[in-house]
Design a protein with these regions (language model features):
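Core dinuclear metal-dependent hydrolase active-site scaffold
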Residues: 1-13, 77, 93-117
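Cap/insert and terminal regions of metallo-dependent hydrolase folds
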Residues: 2-92
């Protein structure tokens, strides 16, 4: 996690949906430089002006010390502590799919996506 991640939203937003990592975070002393925890995902969600969010990077492989089902539980706790409703995050089961509709411009045509030359 880095506060600079909010710059993505400022340059390319607003977003309808954000894929935010919530897993592979324990132990924090070791994983904090590479992986966001659920609390940090909630913080980034707020910095991105609260789009719909799909939690990613959890529940498939045991990559860290937390159990496979802990990240969504910690996410719900983090949302509750932040005073946010849980329905804005859509944790999907393995193989589950959803259809989303939105209004953000297509990335290749978005002016902020153009490379600086």
């Amino acid at each position: 996690y880095s506060e600079r991640l909010a710059e993505i939203g400022q340059r390319l937003g607003p977003f309808d949906v954000a894929a935010l990592p919530i897993g592979a975070y324990a132990p924090r002393w070791f994983m904090q430089e590479q992986h966001m925890d659920p609390q940090q995902s909630v913080a980034l969600y707020r910095e991105l002006n609260q789009p719909r969010a799909i939690p990613i990077h959890w529940g498939v492989f045991e990559l860290a010390d937390e159990s496979l089902d802990e990240p969504p539980q910690q996410l719900n706790l983090a949302l509750s502590e932040a005073g946010l409703e849980q329905h804005q995050f859509l944790p999907l089961k393995i193989g589950e799919r959803i259809a989303l509709q939105g209004s953000s411009p297509a990335l290749p045509n978005h002016p902020a996506a153009q490379r600086d030359e």
